[in-house]
Amino acid sequence: MRIVVLAGGIGGARFLRGLRQAAPDADITVIGNTGDDIHLFGLKVCPDLDTVMYTLGGGINEEQGWGRADETFHLKEELAAYGVGPEWFGLGDRDFATHIVRTQMITAGFPLSAVTEALCDRWKPGVRLIPMTDDRVETHVAVELDGERKAVHFQEYWVRLRASVPAEAVVPVGAEQAKPAPGVLEAIGEADVILFPPSNPVVSIGTILAVPGIREAIADAGVPVVGLSPIVGDAPVRGMADKVLAAVGVESTAAAVAEHYGSGLLDGWLVDTVDADAVTRVRAAGVLCRAVPLMMTDLDATAQMAREALTLAEEVREA
């Protein structure tokens, strides 16, 4: 079975770990979000790609869900001693090495997709990880700070500001001009099932879908497209997805996120058991829906979520 998964960072990576256990013989291709990418200290940092790579490769800081295990921060301390920032973005020493290698390869002329493949040679994530595009795309958020409306990089909004001010707009800058990375459209066209994990529907999966050609390829693939709600009990499972959902006019509910994706894209939708009342509304929107436990409390629970998604995909296929 060939499975394509659109993935952001922590939520997507943890779901993928469960999917690997649930479908050990499947050929899994992950299309990773690069809208979170940021240039810091002259280096290209790809937080979501690295979170997937580290999580599946056994190098992630399990407690926080991002960054490396057994990390040290000597380089960050030295930069701070020179007065060089930003201090709010915590790159560790081991993590810096990844960004140095990536930036060296890109400077030498390699596209991000080839660089990601080379980095995965070390981590052996057990999936094929492809960035959504080799072109530069960075998500910016329009906010009002000190009475002034301005645009900040998504990382600044998420990490420094902790989404403490309302997001007035979310824009994946560069997405309209971007092209899908080599292998993206081919993987979608050859897939038996396409999954949207419980990643952020606006700044993770939404950004991937903003690259021209990707949404259309998924809609035209002719295979089940199944998503899992990142909203449980009208609140994000983790992170601050409600803040960016509000910016695009979507209420923070499991049903509203399904409607946001739309029946033209989505065939099946899993909601948590606490949101069982949403099933009727989602089905009325033309999307097959079931309520199952959606909390990724451990690997077994996550693997069961993945099995439920694949089961729903079969129901879609037979409908």
Curated annotation (Swiss-Prot):
Top-rank taxon: Bacteria
CDD domains assigned: CofD_like
Keyword Magnesium attributed: yes
UniProt keyword list: Magnesium, Transferase
SUPFAM superfamilies from the UniProt entry: CofD-like
GO BP annotations listed: F420-0 metabolic process
InterPro entries xrefs: CofD, CofD-like_dom_sf, FbiA/CofD
Single Gene Ontology MF annotation: LPPG:FO 2-phospho-L-lactate transferase activity
Pathway(s) where this gene product acts: Cofactor biosynthesis; coenzyme F420 biosynthesis
Catalytic activity as recorded in UniProt: enolpyruvoyl-2-diphospho-5'-guanosine + 7,8-didemethyl-8-hydroxy-5-deazariboflavin = dehydro coenzyme F420-0 + GMP + H(+)
EC numbers: 2.7.8.28
Pfam families to which the protein is assigned, alphabetical: CofD
Enzyme category, top tier: transferase
Binding site for 7,8-didemethyl-8-hydroxy-5-deazariboflavin: D50
Cofactor entry: Mg(2+)
Subunit structure: Homodimer.
Family: Belongs to the CofD family.
The protein's role, per its UniProt record: Catalyzes the transfer of the phosphoenolpyruvate moiety from enoylpyruvoyl-2-diphospho-5'-guanosine (EPPG) to 7,8-didemethyl-8-hydroxy-5-deazariboflavin (FO) with the formation of dehydro coenzyme F420-0 and GMP.
Name of the molecule in the record: Phosphoenolpyruvate transferase
Organism from which the protein derives: Streptomyces coelicolor (strain ATCC BAA-471 / A3(2) / M145)
Gene expressing this chain: fbiA
